[in-house]
């Protein structure tokens, strides 16, 4: 009897696998959201979506039906969400904005079926597109919206039904003809009900982007290679800058070109010549009260496709490659990149960028080589070599920094355990010791319980000129020196929560979220212990109330000047703690907000802070955001200061192609008031015109500089 039962279970799984098929049908459709072509009636229907949020129990009340096929040129998808109302709600008509605040349909594709990286395609209920790349980062996955490709979509409101029709060119996807199985996930966001529903069942302790939980679809008759080989994007930009204090100005005219060549359907070559990044959105400013640098994300498109190959070579706080270092002090002359799969289980990444010589900066050549190999279902290894070399014309100067390393990733069959081991070594002129980096991390993830532990050691000479290792650089505010010092860090954390499926009020309660970090100096003496304790109550509408307690024990070795005055904090032992209380409102309303207050000690003094974030939507024409943070620090005889950080973002959507965004940022810590206003017109798919105005003032609202930039590009696909 047991044998019969086992055979039956295997048969059921076999039948399900056979049903998950993307059929090949040699026909085209008109993407209009109407589904009136006969081919749609011939295709199997994929439905039975599960709840994901605010509950992950059972099948969804409002179901979704998905059909899909390909014709060796396009992957066609139709989706119908059976809503309970004719109303719809979207927060934006701007491309590449999170769909978390809109009614939308999402498809995720893992074309290599390696659970490492994938594609993200989303359409909101008014037809606005969002695309991006999903990449694995340690124990989870993140989403980068800066990657773009040309694809077609149409959304249609048909009574209570929300209909989505999509056509994705296969030429835009990395795939291997010998790998006929794609990992595919669908999910639907209904902002009106504040719900998420998903095709392949995923519990909420895992991200809905998690590529380990995709449905495996068999792809019939994949094409041998991409039909299109080239994408060329020439552009022209002009930039006027006026320095008010010194009464100088400068006008630049910059032609540039980007191209992409599909070596194979899974391996791509990218090149950029004389790139201009004047259209890139400004960074969101922060108040930094720590002793170390802050990480900001990469936004430049050239560095983004297959970016997980290059940017995921280390761990948080120790990353040997941080692409934002490239071009930060001098302009990029050219860059080339070869990235993708050379076999179904082998990925490579080769990157080379040359910067120009400036008045105070020498020209540099940056190179990165990465090899990623899937050893088994559970293990993946990565080896890398990074090089920065000073150049003089076509010659190399003996001034370099090189970093080599190897990483080993592990994931268990039940997806509850993830492990990571890292080793790196830095090579520099006349530096031969204390130049290593080690790390060992493990994560455990269960629905009610999550935990992690890690230990890493960083030598003071683990120099990564194009990396991000802020903690080895210690600024001595008394002697105005930067001292390199290695360290060892041990970390652990645990989070326990309980879900209340039958409650009319509570969604879940995070009873305990505790993290501990201990830092040892090169002599194995403890110089910093940090404790983080948090609990939160989440209600059915996803609003939340929470508290956070931070407690730090610091053995300060060098002078620290957070007030930016003439009286830095002197070296010594300090214990300080803060308590923060906060409330986040439901985010599916036209008006939403977050508020918090914090009070406690700070080194030898006191700290009081508060913050507020307000968002108001004028659907679907505008989105207004306002945030304000204040930090009052009193260090007794050393002085006191108050830091203000205010941000306003106003977005106006004229239609799906034309929008106007304005940022106002006031940061007293940086003595800056900044205005950045950008008009963006997508006059042809992924061909843009930008008009950007920037204006900078000091704390006293005295103008320091201003500028205006115009950029026009055009995309050719051959």
Residue ranges of predicted features:
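A generic beta-sheet turn/junction motif
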Residues: 70-72, 100, 159, 375-377, ...
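Exposed, low-structure sequence patches enriched in small/polar residues
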Residues: 331-333, 339, 400-401, 414-718
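Bacterial Sec-dependent N-terminal signal peptides
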Residues: 1-21
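Outer-membrane beta-barrel transmembrane domain signature of Gram-negative proteins
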Residues: 203-227, 356-414, 544-595, 609, ...
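One face of beta-strands
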Residues: 64-66, 103-105, 119, 149-153, ...
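Catalytic-domain carbohydrate-binding cleft regions of carbohydrate-active enzymes
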Residues: 166, 248, 258, 268, ...
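Structural preference for beta-rich elements and adjacent junctions enriched in aromatics
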Residues: 17-372, 381-383
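A short, polar/proline- and glycine-enriched secondary-structure boundary/capping micro-motif
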Residues: 86-93, 130-133, 175-177, 280-283, ...
């Amino acid at each position: 009897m047991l044998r019969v039962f086992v055979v039956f279970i295997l048969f059921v799984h076999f039948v399900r696998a056979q049903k998950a098929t993307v059929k090949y049908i040699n026909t085209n459709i008109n993407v209009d959201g109407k589904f009136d072509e006969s081919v749609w009636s011939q295709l199997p229907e994929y439905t039975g979506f599960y709840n994901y949020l605010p509950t992950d129990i059972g099948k969804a009340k409002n179901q979704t039906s998905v059909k899909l096929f390909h014709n060796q040129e396009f992957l066609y998808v139709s989706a119908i969400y059976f809503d309970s109302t004719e109303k719809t709600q979207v927060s934006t008509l701007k491309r590449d904005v999170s769909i978390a605040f809109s009614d939308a349909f999402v498809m995720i594709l893992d074309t290599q079926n390696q659970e490492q990286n994938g594609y993200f395609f989303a359409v909101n209920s008014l037809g606005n597109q969002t695309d991006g790349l999903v990449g694995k980062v340690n124990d989870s996955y993140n989403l980068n919206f800066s990657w773009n490709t040309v694809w077609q979509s149409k959304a249609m409101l048909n009574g209570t039904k929300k209909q989505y029709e999509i056509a994705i060119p296969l030429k835009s996807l990395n795939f291997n003809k010998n790998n006929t199985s794609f990992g595919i996930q669908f999910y639907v966001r209904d902002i009106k009900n504040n719900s998420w529903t998903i095709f392949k069942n995923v519990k909420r302790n895992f991200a809905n982007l998690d590529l380990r939980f995709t449905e495996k679809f068999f792809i019939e008759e994949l094409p041998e290679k991409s039909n299109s080989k080239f994408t060329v994007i020439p552009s022209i930009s002009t930039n006027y800058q006026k320095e008010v204090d010194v009464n100088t100005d400068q006008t630049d005219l910059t032609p540039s070109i980007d191209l992409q060549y599909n070596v194979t359907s899974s391996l791509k070559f990218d090149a950029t010549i004389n790139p201009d990044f004047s259209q890139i959105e400004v960074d969101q400013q922060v108040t930094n009260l720590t002793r170390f640098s802050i990480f900001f994300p990469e936004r430049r498109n050239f560095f983004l496709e297959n970016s997980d190959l290059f940017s995921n070579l280390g761990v948080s706080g120790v990353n040997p490659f941080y692409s934002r270092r490239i071009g930060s002090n001098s302009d990029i002359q050219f860059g080339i990149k070869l990235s993708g799969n050379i076999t179904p289980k082998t990925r490579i990444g080769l990157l080379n960028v040359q910067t120009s010589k400036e008045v105070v900066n020498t020209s540099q050549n940056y190179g990165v080589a990465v090899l990623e190999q899937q050893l088994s279902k559970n293990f993946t290894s990565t080896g890398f070599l990074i090089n920065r070399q000073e150049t003089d014309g076509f010659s190399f100067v003996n001034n370099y920094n090189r970093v080599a390393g190897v990483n080993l990733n592990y994931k268990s069959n039940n997806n509850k355990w993830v492990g990571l081991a890292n080793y790196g070594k830095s090579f520099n002129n006349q530096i031969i010791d204390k130049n290593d980096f080690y790390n060992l991390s493990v994560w455990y993830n269960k629905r009610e319980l999550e935990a992690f532990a890690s230990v890493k050691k960083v030598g003071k000479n683990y120099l990564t000129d194009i990396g991000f290792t802020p903690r080895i650089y210690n600024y001595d505010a008394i002697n105005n020196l930067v001292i390199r010092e290695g360290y060892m860090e041990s970390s652990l954390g645990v989070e326990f929560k309980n879900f209340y499926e039958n409650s009319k009020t509570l969604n879940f309660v995070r009873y305990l979220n505790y993290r501990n970090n201990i830092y040892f100096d090169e002599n194995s003496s403890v110089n910093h212990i940090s404790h983080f304790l948090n609990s939160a109550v989440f209600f059915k509408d996803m609003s939340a109330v929470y508290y956070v307690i931070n407690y730090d024990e610091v053995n300060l070795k060098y002078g620290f000047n957070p007030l930016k005055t003439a009286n830095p904090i002197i070296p010594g032992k300090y214990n300080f703690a803060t308590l923060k209380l906060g409330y986040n409102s439901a985010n599916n309303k036209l008006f939403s907000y977050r508020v918090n207050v914090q009070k406690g000690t700070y080194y030898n003094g006191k700290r009081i802070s508060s913050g507020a974030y307000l968002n108001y939507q004028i659907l679907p024409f505008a989105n207004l955001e306002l945030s304000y943070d204040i930090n009052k620090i009193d260090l007794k005889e050393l002085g006191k200061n108050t830091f203000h950080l205010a941000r306003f973002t106003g977005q106006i959507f004229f239609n799906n192609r034309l929008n106007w965004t304005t940022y106002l940022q006031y940061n007293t810590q940086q003595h800056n008031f900044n205005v950045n206003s950008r008009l963006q017109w997508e006059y042809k798919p992924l061909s843009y015109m930008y008009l950007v105005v920037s204006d900078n003032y000091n704390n006293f609202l005295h103008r320091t500089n201003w500028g205006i930039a115009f950029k026009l590009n055009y995309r050719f696909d051959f």
